[in-house]
């Protein structure tokens, strides 16, 4: 179809792109009952792994977007991350064998297609309109809506692109989640900041056929990711991908033509020469050229159009935060769009999306860029100096996970609780006969949680009505039932003890908006949120 949009072509949100960012946004927004239209250039989900790992915060986002058990059915905790020299000597060893505050392992080794299938199923079940095989051509924002024009796209038997109908849809808001070559970003002529380090992997994904032998002192079956530096050769790495899959990477020229290497013969020669593996050990099913670099869009919003995920930022893979950052974009923008679309918040809160997310992403781009440049040193003397420093314990600090210092949070003055702006916990709770992770028991959204008291008793009618309008769960958590949810694994007791607070008000992206030192301060926290939302 073409021409003026009909009633069936008008939506609350149009999402360009249906990778992890678009999938998460489509699921979260449709869960809230909004009319969502997805336009994706490829005819189906990609179906192959790209992300190798996510952190516990991202796992909680996926939990909000779909059935987490289905999403992680082939995943395992990632135990360690090692940087080694070409002799196999450890330079950097990051232990990851503990739990994340969000209720999942600190890092998860995953099979990405499972996650995408689960989010796709949720989005469709919740009524999102998913249009695969439609490539966005242009985006035209106006004061009251944005129009998106797309064209039907398919690949013929001759492997050439075939174009079909043109369609124009109209939405109150548009999310450009269409990747590094974003048509939305290009349509709006948004530029990008460039980081200095660039390189590439030749990636070979495989299924393990049997227990693998130790490789340079590391067991590939132990959920340990290892990068081997090679100043006189080519760096390489082995990365577990959940229960059955594994990725082998080999350094490549990011500007070179590697078509002669993306095949079975080259891949197995590489595995035999470097790792001593053969077809008896693994079955390779994917051959890919993966260039990487750091880039950041100069703006993430023009009027009613937003960028998210790889359309807004790229980073090298060495901190495993590219996909995590994309999922954070999706949930941050989704909960704010939800409130604006439902009329429970002022549109001005959308300005906080870029203000909150951009500095957060920059930390990870900087950190992964620095780690990659260090791992790929090609000067032999510089590599020897690096090795000596690392083996002597003179290791540059890995960036700590950033937290919010401004945006939609209570004042972070000296008197304010330190928990503000940090991630809130998710523990196991029991309500009646139901026991599970907090979000599974109570649902996704705002959370007002009191320690050993029900926060509802401290609120007046207006405050309670406001929390109901924004879909906030209000619950007390304690050691015994007595009208409260039971803190089954002690997570909340430990959290409240460590932070010295009696209540926390948590945003839908699991960031602590505000906290109260004592129950009597709880109403002030609620009023502050109401003021900031303009509700």
Language model features by range: what are they?
Residues 1-12, 16, 31-32, 85-88, ...:
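Helical substrate-recognition/capping region of FAD-dependent monooxygenase/halogenase enzymes
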Residues 48-122, 230:
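Active-site-adjacent segment of FAD-dependent monooxygenases/related oxidoreductases
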Residues 156-160, 173-292:
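Conserved FAD-binding catalytic core of PHBH/FMO-like flavoproteins
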